[in-house]
Each structure stands twice: as structure tokens, then as C-alpha cells.
């Protein structure tokens, strides 16, 4: 057992079972009743306000979910300048660790059993109006002996039925870039709902079956572009032993538009159970028409833009021209609520491909007394994106901005304080 320097009143610490960049997890038992527990703490001795909020968020959401498939949360203890989250310990290890410990990946039988259990869990979240937003192998625990599967880490989960992701630098986006749904990037002109978890589950399935992520890159912006616009190689191409219908199921989960994915976890579960039934009876899985039982019980209007193809095309053509070192300015006008913002937001997708920055400003009839209000709004947004870049990138921008502004720099700073 490794030496540990963590103590918490009322608990006997046994060993450390996880060490991440942000959190540490210890195995322990409660002294009062000898109950085995897992204790999660933040690695940072002086955590930021947002880290503390996320820690409380996962306790607040998970404490009321004493349900199969979701880790049970016992208490939130005060620990130094932070918190300690006390959860059940059912002898599980992360799915990531479970697959890494084996020379080969999970068998088809094991994969299907895990997939069916996770479908059940997503159905539970759906019925409780919870969006997890960070489904990945590291957040899925499995008991190596009983094969029981449980979902953990509700730190960025949401109780809202729908969210709008604001445009942010990829380095500070919520979630894990390799598993992020297109709408979670904030660059799809679409809101986030329960179907974002289906995409992340699809990436998880892909990794379990292929032994690799569908998109691999160390460049955050390139990863975003892949999630938004690129199709990964099909699982059947990577490994011919994977039945084509399983490849089809995973591809449907990973559809770019939410309305093209599965619309219910039970529809997904039915298909996986049928695959398992075939495998147990015949030793192989034949192709069949998937998603025949996939019916959502919520009325969801597709977030497509209708009747504005000409205007969107005009904007995209202008963007292609300015990508070749030209400068253009375009103004979009119209009455309130006519859809100006929706049209402008459509330009975000090609901007990611060209590694550009997307900023916008809106002239508001209630802010007519503020000169250049839309320009100020747009450039304050740009400064916010630049400030989350690396020090090296910031240095380049600092040099360029100082050269361009010269003696006028102080004047601009008074208008845009972030500068």
C-alpha cells in the first residue's frame, strides 16, 4: 500500500485509488459502522470558486439519485479550504482502467452487457431531467468480478432541460474534448439537451470496440473541428470482426445533429439487447434495421435554419474571401426576432476549420445612448477568448495589438478594459 498523507475525521483511510490532474480519490471505511466508502477531494489546496461550485453541484444532484446504475453519494464533508465527497465503494474501477489492464479489449458479450447497463442509466437520467455532459470511460465504474456498472462525476451535470453553450476558447470548455458533442463546443448554433450524452456514449462505445478514440489530436481546435464536421472511420473498417450493425449503432449515436441520433435510451437498449440475444443464440450478430423502437416521449423541434440558405451562403462566401488576407465588413439588419443572430451564428463552423475567432456585437435599441456599443461588445468578447490562450500565444497578440494601436492604446483600454 502506498504511503498516504490524507486524513478525514471519522474515516479510516486505506489507500489512494485514483490520482487525476484535478482530483484525488481514496478508498476508506467509515469508523462508526465500518461502511466501505470512496472519498473524492480536490488536488488543489486553494481551489477556485468554480471548482468549489462544481464539487457542490455533483453532491446536490447525486445525493437524491439513490438508483441502480448511479453511484450513491453519502455526504459532503468540509476539508481544509475545500470539500470531501463521500460516496459508496462497490469495488469498482474505471472502465478506462478496466480496459487498459487487459491485453485485448472487452469481448462482444462484455461490451453489450456494459452497453445495456449504460443505456438503463441514461434512461434514469432522462426521466430525472438530468444532462450529465461528461460521459467517458473515466467516469464509468465497473466491478471486475460482478460486472456491475455505475456512472460517477456529476460536477458539470445540469438539471435544465436545455442549455445554450456560449462561445469559449476550447481550453476552458466544460467537459472532455475527446468526448465532446458538437453542440457542447458552442460552435454549432444549437442548444444542449439530453441527446448530448448519447454522442459522448457513442464515443465511449467506439473507444471500447476500436481501442482508440474516433478523433485523435493534441490540438484543441482541430479536435473541435473533427467533432463538428468530420466523420471517423467506421468501426467495421478498423476491425472487420466487429459486426456491421454494431458499427451502425455507434455511428447513429455519434451523428453530428442531435435529431439524427437515438431519441431515447430505451430505443438504444432494445437494439443492444437484440444483438446480445443473437450472440447468445447463434454466436454471431446479423444485420437488422436499427432504431425501430426508438421513440422519444418529448416534443422536440429540430434546430435547423429554414428559408435562409441564400443569406447564409452569402456570409460563408464572404468568410472564404477574408480567409485569403482580405478585409470585409458585413452588416445584418432586420426587425427584432426575425433571426439575425441565428444566421450570423451559422458562420461559426467554417471558422473552426480555419482556426479563426468568432466575435459578434449587436446594436440594441435600449442602448442607443452608448456609442459603438456593438463594436465594444464584440471586441470585449475577443479579449475574453484571447485571455484564455497560452502565454506564448498571448505574447504574439500583445505585440500585434501594440504595433497596430501605437499611441492610441490607452484610449482603447478605457473603452475595452479587458485589453
What are the functions of these language-model segments?
Residues 114-115:
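Activation segment signature within eukaryotic-like protein kinase domains
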Residues 80-94:
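Conserved short submotifs of the Hanks-type protein kinase catalytic core
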Residues 46-64:
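AlphaC helix of the eukaryotic protein kinase fold
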Residues 76:
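Activation-segment/catalytic-loop signature of the eukaryotic protein kinase fold
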Residues 120-130:
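Protein kinase catalytic-loop region centered on the HRD/HxD motif
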Residues 146-189:
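Activation segment of protein kinases
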Residues 176-281, 333:
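C-terminal lobe helix-coil module of Hanks-type protein kinase domains
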Residues 373-419:
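Conserved Walker-type P-loop NTP-binding/catalytic site
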Amino acid at each position: 500500500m502506498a504511503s498516504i498523507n490524507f486524513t478525514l475525521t471519522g474515516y479510516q483511510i486505506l489507500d489512494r485509488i485514483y490520482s487525476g490532474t484535478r482530483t484525488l480519490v481514496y478508498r476508506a471505511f467509515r469508523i462508526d459502522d465500518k461502511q466501505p466508502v470512496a472519498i473524492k477531494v480536490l488536488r488543489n489546496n486553494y481551489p477556485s470558486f468554480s471548482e468549489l461550485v462544481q464539487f457542490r453541484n455533483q453532491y446536490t444532484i447525486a445525493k437524491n439519485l439513490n438508483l441502480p446504475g448511479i453511484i450513491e453519494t453519502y455526504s459532503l464533508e468540509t476539508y481544509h479550504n475545500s470539500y470531501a465527497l463521500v460516496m459508496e465503494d462497490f469495488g469498482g474501477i474505471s472502465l478506462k482502467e478496466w480496459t487498459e489492464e487487459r491485453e485485448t479489449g472487452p469481448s462482444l458479450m462484455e461490451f453489450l452487457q456494459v452497453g445495456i447497463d449504460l443505456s438503463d442509466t441514461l434512461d434514469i437520467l432522462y426521466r430525472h431531467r438530468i444532462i450529465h455532459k461528461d460521459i467517458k470511460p473515466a467516469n464509468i465504474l465497473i466491478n471486475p468480478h460482478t460486472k456491475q456498472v455505475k456512472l460517477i462525476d456529476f460536477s458539470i451535470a445540469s438539471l435544465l432541460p436545455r442549455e445554450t453553450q456560449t462561445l469559449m476558447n476550447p481550453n476552458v470548455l466544460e467537459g472532455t474534448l475527446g468526448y465532446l458533442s458538437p453542440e457542447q463546443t458552442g460552435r454549432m448554433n444549437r442548444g444542449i439537451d439530453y441527446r448530448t450524452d448519447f454522442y459522448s456514449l457513442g464515443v465511449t462505445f467506439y473507444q471500447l470496440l476500436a481501442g482508440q478514440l474516433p478523433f485523435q489530436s493534441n490540438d484543441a481546435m482541430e479536435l473541435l473541428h473533427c467533432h463538428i464536421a468530420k466523420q471517423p472511420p467506421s468501426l467495421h473498417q478498423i476491425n472487420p470482426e466487429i459486426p456491421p450493425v454494431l458499427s451502425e449503432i455507434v455511428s447513429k449515436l455519434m451523428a453530428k445533429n442531435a435529431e439524427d441520433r437515438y431519441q431515447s435510451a430505451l430505443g438504444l437498449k432494445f437494439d443492444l439487447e437484440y444483438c446480445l440475444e443473437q450472440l447468445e443464440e447463434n454466436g454471431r450478430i446479423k444485420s437488422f434495421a436499427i432504431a425501430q423502437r426508438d421513440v422519444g416521449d418529448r416534443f422536440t423541434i429540430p434546430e435547423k435554419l429554414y428559408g435562409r440558405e441564400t443569406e447564409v451562403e452569402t456570409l460563408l462566401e464572404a468568410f472564404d474571401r477574408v480567409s485569403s488576407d482580405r478585409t470585409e465588413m458585413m452588416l445584418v439588419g432586420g426587425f427584432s426576432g426575425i433571426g439575425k443572430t441565428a444566421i450570423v451564428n451559422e458562420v461559426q463552423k467554417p471558422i473552426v476549420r480555419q482556426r479563426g475567432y468568432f466575435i459578434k456585437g449587436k446594436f440594441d435599441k435600449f442602448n442607443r445612448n452608448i456609442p459603438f456599443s456593438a463594436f465594444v461588445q464584440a471586441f470585449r468578447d475577443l479579449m475574453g477568448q484571447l485571455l484564455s490562450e497560452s502565454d506564448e500565444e498571448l505574447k504574439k497578440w500583445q505585440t500585434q495589438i501594440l504595433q497596430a494601436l501605437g499611441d492610441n492604446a490607452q484610449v482603447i483600454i478605457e473603452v475595452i478594459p479587458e485589453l
